Amino acid sequence: MTVIPNVVSEMPIPVMLAVIVVLVGLPIIFIKDALTRSKGAMPAPTDVRKAGKGNEWDKLNKHHTPKLRGSRKALATDVHARLLAPSFPYALCHGNPVDALAVSEPSSTKEMLSRDWEVTNRLELLRQLYWLLQEGHRKDFGHTREQCGNPSWVKNRLARVNEVADEQTDAWEERWRIHRFLNNDRGINDVDFGAWDFIRAAMLIRAGAALGFITDEEAWDTLAIINHALHMSYSSWDEAWDAFRLTRWLWAAKGQAQEAENDLHDRNRGEFLIGKNGLWTAIPWDLPSPTSRFLLLDVLATEGGLHLLSPSGWEDASAWEREFDTQTRTRAPMSIGGKPIVH
């Protein structure tokens, strides 16, 4: 019984102080980690700490901590939260309440729409949404991926872009993407790019509704379209997230340093979405969502803004794109190939 007191009495004061600090600090660390996890975050993984990126991870935890007006548990039964789910990735980055059709900073949201999307009014927003739902970036990425299976095209195209890649950003990025497809980096040749377009469309809907460019009714209805598109394209939140982050990587087309920074960002963001306490984890993938009336198409029909897939486009289209085109045809004028709605 006297062993411990004897050891303590013989312990040098600096060592004793260090032991006390450890004994006091460990519970604090455990409590801090528990609180962090309860918010959907995860303490920096071992490999991140070893790489000297622990501080960056901690900053990302603060950046991505979700703003909830309700509880995380309520997400599973909240119809509106289910509709808003595709907008969560950008809500985390923008500091918006994930479970409400609102933004935290209207002025910066307005600036973002104008700067990044050239959207300053209702019609411009509707046209951007229509483009994302009908074809988006996935059309060009899919075309490039297909062409990369043709050695002759690859040789000629690389010869052209190599001439200007050092001076033109677009050419440099195209060359970068061609090599990614040729090497099948990150399994990019098997990725369905749709999530990249659908999730960005959900972000635009939140922003547009908050700024009054579209009505709440139009916003909820178009979010229902996006949820349906995701369900037709993927089998789980995990699969949708992987498709989004990989297509975002392809779109960004950055050098190694920036690529590593983006990877860390999305790894952290993914913890808040599909981690053990993630927002998407709280919402069952197969939870039913309201059926859309495709109000977006009704509005654009009055503006002459509808376009139909060509026969060749139809052949290459996904199941979702064909359904969207069918809905478009029932509203488009006969002069461009539309047909009257059949009841």
Predicted regions and their residues:
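Short, strongly hydrophobic alpha-helical membrane anchors
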Residues: 1-11
